[in-house]
Regions:
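Short, Lys/Arg-enriched N-terminal segment that forms or immediately precedes the first helix
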Residues: 9-21
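Short, leucine-enriched amphipathic alpha-helices that occur as contiguous helical runs
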Residues: 10, 27-28
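Short capping segments at the starts of secondary-structure elements
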Residues: 26, 37-43
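Pre-recognition alpha-helix immediately N-terminal to the DNA-recognition helix
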Residues: 29-34
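A short acidic, leucine-rich amphipathic alpha-helix
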Residues: 46-52, 63
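Basic amphipathic alpha-helical segments that dock to polyanions
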Residues: 63-73
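Non-DNA-binding regulatory cores of transcription-related proteins
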Residues: 72-155
């Protein structure tokens, strides 16, 4: 997390709430603060469980709706991974792509200028103007790849 404790993101969210004439609430602030403290990709249920430790009265629907507001405010990005939505911090983050483990669900971020250059080159060659992309590579993380296959484990 940034050294300012997410202060700038909190200001952006407060401005978004005011601009859209939405209600400021303690529940939304707890959800935002909890989200900003995380360094991983969270499902609604993941975030709800973390929020429940601080405020058991906050429901899953409130967490979901607040995540959608964070997304609309440019603070969170929703990723569809293996049929489940996960959210990550987006505000002022450099572009990156994802390796996703199909066994344990671990998500590893990476950035590679060469991949970006090749994509741009291919797009230019066919006259395509890239406005954005999401690159997700599915496979096995180091830990899962090192495990023996289940068939061999039973022998």
């Amino acid at each position: 997390m940034k050294a300012n404790g997410g202060r700038e993101e909190k200001e952006v969210f407060a401005a978004y709430i005011a601009k859209n004439r939405l209600k400021r609430s303690g529940q939304r602030e707890v959800i935002l603060d909890t989200f900003l403290r995380q360094q991983r990709h969270l499902s609604v249920d993941d975030l709800h469980q973390l929020v429940q430790k601080r405020r058991p009265d906050i429901g899953r629907t409130t967490v979901y709706r607040t995540l959608k507001l964070l997304q609309a405010a440019g603070l969170a990005q929703e990723l569809a991974l293996d049929g489940q939505s996960r959210f990550e911090r987006e505000y002022k983050r450099a572009h990156h792509d994802h390796f996703i483990c199909k066994s344990c669900g671990e998500i590893l971020e990476f950035s590679n200028p060469e991949i970006e250059r090749i994509q741009d080159e291919i797009a230019a060659g066919i006259g395509f103007v890239i406005e954005g992309h999401r690159h997700q590579i599915f496979g096995l993380c180091r830990r899962c790849a090192a495990r023996p296959p289940r068939d061999e484990a039973r022998r």
